[in-house]
Amino acid sequence: MTAEFISSIEEIIEDQKNGKMVIMVDDESRENEGDLILPAEKVDDKAVNFMAKYGRGLICLPLTASRVRELNLPLMAQNNQERDPTAFTISIEAKEGVTTGISAQDRATTIQTAIDKNKCENDITSPGHVFPLVARDGGVLVRAGHTEASVDLARLSGNIPASVICEIMNDDGTMARVPDLIKFSQKHQIKIGRIVDLISYRLEKDTNIKLTHEGKIDLMQENEFDLKIYESLVDKTEQIVLSKGDVSNGEPVMVRVYAVSYTHLRAHET
């Protein structure tokens, strides 16, 4: 893809923060498609209508796995046989505030109901005209799809981690590829970003671990160490950090890394 037409992830995040749609493209070896993406809390009837009129693809609602559990939404297919499986749940509709459910206003109402933390499964019904997708925990670092990219962008831009996406199709019904997406971008003044760049951004600048436990521990003849346990937000693995003294003064600190073999530990325990 010609670099001059690609915006930085920082620019993409800024537009998402300001309620502007962006186009995200995935790898040519994958779907090789571009999706319109907008944080769900920024979506109104005008946004839905734009996606339906100009995007032309299926309008979907990527949600975190935790939100899907809160809404008690089962997967559409238990045995997903897609080439690049997308986790569709059953379709939904807001229980109140809609008519037939298909209008731009009705779909916007359903979207806002689904992401409202004060709403629960009793506030939606199925089937409907909005198609939730389950984003993998860990985002694009686990699965480099539009579902995960859109939720990552919503979170990184300070919005509720939920998004609305729509594949872009050409006038003749074929899928829009890079040359078509560039023309679409220029016509509608919408920035283009790449999922591969979002992956790099997250690896470099995003916080991918969280502190879960900290305390003191006596080791090696009663020498006291600070103990901290960090959990990966990507794959839930844990890392144990032992430190002694002040390691935050900017001075170089010797670091040793030990790979723990649980098989070896169990062998010694027996």
Where would I find each of the regions flagged by the language model?
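N-terminal glycine-/serine-/threonine-rich phosphate-binding loop
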Residues: T2-R30, D35-I37
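Structural motif
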Residues: K20-I23, D35-I37, G57-C60, A87-I90, ...
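Glycine-rich phosphate/pyrophosphate-binding loops
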Residues: E31, H129-F131, L141-V142, E148-M175, ...
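Feature captures the catalytic cores and cofactor-binding loops of soluble hydro-lyases/lyases
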Residues: N32, K42-I59, N159, S163, ...
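Hydrophobic alpha-helical hairpins/lids featuring a short glycine-rich hinge
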Residues: Q81-G138
